[in-house]
Amino acid sequence: FCLSRGLGDVYKRQIIYTSGSTGTPKGVEISHGNMAAECMDALQYMPRAIDIPDRRLLLFLPLSHVFARFMATVAFAGTLTLGLTSNMKTIIKDFEDFGPTLLLAVPRVFEKVYNAASQRAGTGFAGRMFARGVRVAREWSKAKQSGNGIPAGLRMRHAFYDAVVYKKIRTVFGRNADFAITGGAPMDSDLAHFYNGIGMPLLEGYGMTETSGPVCVSLPENNHIGTIGQPLCG
């Protein structure tokens, strides 16, 4: 729409400030053309996330963040249903009520969920079950990523822990979520293998305020832990 109306790179859409992690925050001018091109690239590169029916995202990044602005815009370009929340104290209930199909969060959010699950399991029998389940999830993920197949014994142990441990952790994110996109900080590989092993792949990406959003992102069908995926078109 922006490009068809001739708005393009001439007309400024917004000014978004950088985080200031490398110095004084800078105001970045982003044009209608910048954001329109970014959205079109995302629709072509990652349709499973934003351009098939019944996709839902609960956005809890602040709208002062360029990625939140990008997702709010691309929702209109695709078929993504977008929910907004700002209260982290109610986020678990919000996940349950809204039922997102994908998640978008910095690595710290997934660390907190893992730590909370570990603390809740405690140090008794439940704690030992959780610890064993964690080991099996990581082994399963690494075996799958190796491309050499998953041994039968590991598949059986994984199926057992999926029923008694992993399913409960997945429900924290709602009933429909099948993968998550994360960035903004390095993701610990052990944590990434754990989530991949329980059936919630964390797709790492990279972007900057100056690029209007994402530059690279991993895909669900081609997710190599420890990488940020392929660059978007353009």
Model-identified regions with their sequence ranges:
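Conserved ATP-binding loop and adjacent catalytic segment of the adenylate-forming AMP-binding
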Residues: 154-156, 175-182, 187-234
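Conserved AMP-binding/adenylation subdomain of ANL enzymes
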Residues: 36-166, 176
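Short, structured coil segments at secondary-structure junctions
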Residues: 6, 78, 98, 198-201
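Single conserved hydrophobic/aromatic residue that forms the stacking wall/gate
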Residues: 1-11
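Conserved S/T- and glycine-rich ATP-binding loop of Class I adenylate-forming
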Residues: 12, 18-21, 57, 62, ...
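Alpha-helix/helix-capping structural signal
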Residues: 33, 108, 185-186
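Conserved AMP-binding A3 loop
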Residues: 13-39
